[in-house]
UniProtKB/Swiss-Prot annotation:
Pfam families hit by this protein: PDZ_2, PDZ_3, Trypsin_2
GO biological process, one term: proteolysis
Designated name of the protein: Putative protease Do-like 13
Species, as recorded: Arabidopsis thaliana (Mouse-ear cress)
Ranges for domain PDZ: 241-334
Length: 486
């Protein structure tokens, strides 16, 4: 059964909201009949994938095959969902009405927005393939067609419904809250990555359903897709979604009075600014944000867009491009101020459930060190939280066998900055004892030379080919005696 927000892969400074590209309610509605040209631009995607083993990062889990959908866009590219090609080994694309499979490469993948771009070298594939045009955010009750290759058959499927809701929601495959569209059109596993059209224009991409409800399918809106594509076209890679990187609270009448707001003012109260935010040296704790780019902020952190539904203030920021600025109107100690803030993408210490990247790890004396796989903000200096994910049993570590999932604070009293730094500190240790201080206060003491000589035997006994991941091996400054194959 598809659970709440589960992806649909088979087998599992202008005072307007520029980024959402809202049109006036007078826009002419095109009849939502799916034409042959649209259907021919929708493809079936077969993916062979293998997830990394989190506890044993040098291993992969058994291979599996899954099915999804995609569609052709200008530039000889194919749009699909990130979860359709996650951890891919091989991606094959099949055109409508054809048995031939074409090998595809993943050009870019955006986990947060659950989107990916595929490219195919074969000239034959692109014959008679017409790219689909991305439209705008639809309006409530507009009719839409969901097109793709869901479970239940091999031929293309078209289902019809209406736009039932537009609001921000958590993307199941990502780690961010973004605008989304809900529809009552039937959506099933395999629809993921397929276009949702009004006439010949794509207004969304199918990506997940609400499992504990009836007939609620979720779409990635065209403005989010455009943001993703624009970033890839400008930089050649996924650039992410911008954020002010600050925390705020709603304001009731008592709070507004305390912070000297008059009866006509509305806004939200900043209570924390991330140390890596571009706003750190501009905004202050307990500043009140009254508006963003001229759009008033309500006391509950929402904004009102003319002729549209109320939405979160974060949506005024998230779809801006890297390096754009926004104008903030601030109330500080009863006085009004205006500041321009340059926006940067949200950076995470380690994106939850990394995809398409071999996990980083380092093994010494049987202790398996990895970066924490949980959402955290990341500093420009590459700071990470390093934890012990597993202890490969040996006489040297038997007393520490239960010391798993614990943060490593320091090595020989030097604070650990990231996994690479921990590796360097251990490999270049020049003291008799190696001292590891953990996050809960416990300490690990190892005879360094004995531990170093034991590492080779431990790796061989546990059938581990390498003492560290390739990304650590490529660092020439790290001189590791245990990087050879055992």
């Amino acid at each position: 059964m598809i659970q709440l927000n589960e992806p649909l892969t088979h087998v599992r400074t202008k005072p307007i909201l520029i980024s959402l590209e809202f049109e006036s309610p007078g826009r002419k509605t095109i009849d939502s009949v799916a034409t042959e040209s649209v259907l021919n631009s929708v493809v079936k995607i077969n993916t062979f994938s293998s997830k990394p083993n989190i506890c044993y990062p040098w291993q992969n889990k058994p291979q599996k095959k899954s099915k999804g959908s995609g569609f052709v866009i200008p530039g000889k590219m194919i749009i699909t969902n990130a979860h359709v090609v996650a951890n891919h080994i091989l991606v094959l694309v099949i055109k409508r009405g054809s048995p031939k499979k074409y090998k595809a490469e993943v050009k870019a993948i955006g986990r947060e927005c659950d989107l990916a771009i595929l490219v195919i070298e074969s000239k034959e594939f692109w014959e008679d393939m017409n790219p689909l045009e991305l439209g705008d955010m639809p309006f409530l009750q507009e009719s839409v067609n969901v097109i793709g290759y869901p479970t239940g058959g091999e031929n293309i499927s078209v289902t019809k419904g209406v736009v039932s809701r537009i609001e921000s929601m958590d993307y199941a495959h990502g780690a961010i809250n973004l605008p989304a569209i809900q529809t009552d059109a039937a959506m099933n596993p395999g629809n993921s990555g397929g276009p949702v059209c009004i006439g010949n224009k794509v207004v969304g991409v199918a990506f997940q359903t609400l499992g504990h409800s009836n007939n609620i399918g979720c779409l990635i809106p065209a403005p989010v897709v455009k943001h993703f594509i624009t970033g890839v076209e400008k930089t050649g890679q996924y650039v992410g979604f911008c954020s002010l990187n600050l925390s705020y609270q709603h304001m009731d009448a008592q709070t507004r009075s305390h912070f000297k707001m008059n009866s006509e003012m509305t806004g939200i109260l900043i209570y924390n600014i991330n140390q890596h935010s571009d706003a750190l040296n501009i905004l202050k704790k307990y500043d009140v944000i009254l508006s963003i780019d001229g759009v008033a902020i309500e006391n509950d952190g929402t904004v009102i867009i003319p002729n549209r539904e109320r939405t979160r203030l974060d949506d005024l920021v998230s779809l801006k491009q890297l390096g754009e600025t926004i104008l903030l109107k601030i109330l500080r100690e009863g006085k009004m101020h205006e500041f321009n803030i340059t926006l940067r993408p949200v950076q995470r210490l380690v994106p939850a459930g990394q995809i398409d990247n071999n996990p980083s790890y380092y093994i010494f004396a049987g202790f398996v060190f990895v970066p924490l796989r949980k959402q955290h903000f990341k500093g420009s200096n590459g700071e990470q939280i390093v934890v012990i994910s597993e202890v490969l049993a040996d006489v040297i570590n038997v007393e520490y066998y239960m010391y798993k999932h614990l943060k490593v604070n320091s090595v020989n009293k030097v604070k650990v900055e990231n996994l690479k730094h921990l590796c360097e500190l251990i490999e270049k240790c020049c003291t008799k004892d190696l001292r590891l201080e953990l996050g809960d206060g416990r300490v690990i003491i190892l005879d360094y030379q004995f531990a170093k000589s034991s590492t080779s035997l431990i790796l061989e006994r546990h059938r581990v080919p390498w003492a560290m991941s390739k990304d650590l091996m490529t660092d020439q400054s790290t001189t590791c005696s245990s990087t050879r194959l055992y």
